[in-house]
């Protein structure tokens, strides 16, 4: 099977995105991520396999899903609505196919490159007018490196620029190969925490490979100017003065120039609940501390800094 005919699970394709790279963009969210960030805003994208979303508020109480479920995994609570026994459910999706109220639906859809482009290339005129394009995100796009490479090549034939959104946790050679493609104009590189103990505690993996890959891209003349560092900021976790200053020193060492600060938000809590999980709630930095972090990067380190999603 060629990469052109291959397919991946796509969680969603978000049109008119303005915070996933420059200009107006279409963001493609690929399913599967090796990290398990406790504050993840797309937790339904972590598992590489298909999952079933349950939205009790949409349930009309017809009971049809209960009748057709071959695993007897669905029940109806008079007060809480529809309930799925995740230990019994085998994600056959028979219920989702029959639920026109959309109380049950799959997290993702299997899509080929042509199917992705059929949607993404619809807005080319907006990309051209705003300096936008397509952003490949996740999950973690490196999980599907070969597929992403083929997608980028097909996008190039249509004269559309690509932005890669990555945690940097993956094969360095594969990342560099993607990043060096002429059609890739921007790389959004996540910096969860420079402290490895904190990183392991809150993402489930070491940051050693992430920092090595970041240094590689920052020191490569073909990719260094494409880098945008993205820093999710969680109060008391990765926003301490020690961590912020260590991060800034590392940025100076490798020559990083552009930084996006992303204060924590709790949008992932309901998404996690809808796939049967529970996500801890955190807090963003105070407005005062966020401003100090911004000023540190901007006025002391002379970096190009912006804050996204500021409340």
Task: Give a label for each model feature.
Residues 11-64, 82-91:
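N-terminal pre-triad scaffold of radical SAM enzymes
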Residues 114-262, 267, 272:
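Conserved AdoMet/S-adenosylmethionine-binding subsite of the radical SAM
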Residues 102, 158, 300:
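Conserved dinucleotide-binding and phosphotransfer motif residues
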Residues 38-45, 64-84, 94-110:
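Iron-sulfur cluster-binding cysteine motifs and their immediate structural context
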Residues 1-22, 233-311:
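Auxiliary Fe-S-binding modules of radical SAM enzymes
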Residues 45, 54-56, 200-206, 275-283:
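Short glycine-enriched, charge-decorated loop/helix-capping segments at active-site entrances
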Residues 54-60, 108-123:
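Extended, non-globular alpha-helical segments
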């Amino acid at each position: 099977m060629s990469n052109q005919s291959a397919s991946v699970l796509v969680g969603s394709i978000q049109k008119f995105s303005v915070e996933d790279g420059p200009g107006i963009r279409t963001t493609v969210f690929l399913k599967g991520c090796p990290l398990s960030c406790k504050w993840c805003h797309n937790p339904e994208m972590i598992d590489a396999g298909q999952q079933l979303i349950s939205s009790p508020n949409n349930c009309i109480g017809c009971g049809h899903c209960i009748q057709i479920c071959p695993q007897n995994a669905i029940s109806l609570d008079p007060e809480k609505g529809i309930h799925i026994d995740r230990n019994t459910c085998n994600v056959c999706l028979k219920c989702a196919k029959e639920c026109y109220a959309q109380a049950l639906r799959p997290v993702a859809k299997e899509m080929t490159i042509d199917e992705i482009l059929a949607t993404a290339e619809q807005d080319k005129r907006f990309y051209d007018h705003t300096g936008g394009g397509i952003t490949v995100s996740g999950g973690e796009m490196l999980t599907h490196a070969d597929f992403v490479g083929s997608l980028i090549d097909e996008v190039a034939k249509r004269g559309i620029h690509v932005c890669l959104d990555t945690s940097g946790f993956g094969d360095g050679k594969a990342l560099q190969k993607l990043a060096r493609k002429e059609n890739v104009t921007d790389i959004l590189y996540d910096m969860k925490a420079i402290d490895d103990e904190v990183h392991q505690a809150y993402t489930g993996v070491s940051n050693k490979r992430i920092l090595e890959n970041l240094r590689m891209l920052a020191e490569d003349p073909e990719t260094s100017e494409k880098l945008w560092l993205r820093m999710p900021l969680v109060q008391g976790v990765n926003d301490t003065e020690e961590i912020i200053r260590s991060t800034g020193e590392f940025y100076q060492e490798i020559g990083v120039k552009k930084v996006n600060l992303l204060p924590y938000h709790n949008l992932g809590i309901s998404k996690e609940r809808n796939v049967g999980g529970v996500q801890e709630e955190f807090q963003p930095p105070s407005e005062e501390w966020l401003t100090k972090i911004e000023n540190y990067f901007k006025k002391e380190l002379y970096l190009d800094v912006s804050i996204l999603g500021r409340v």
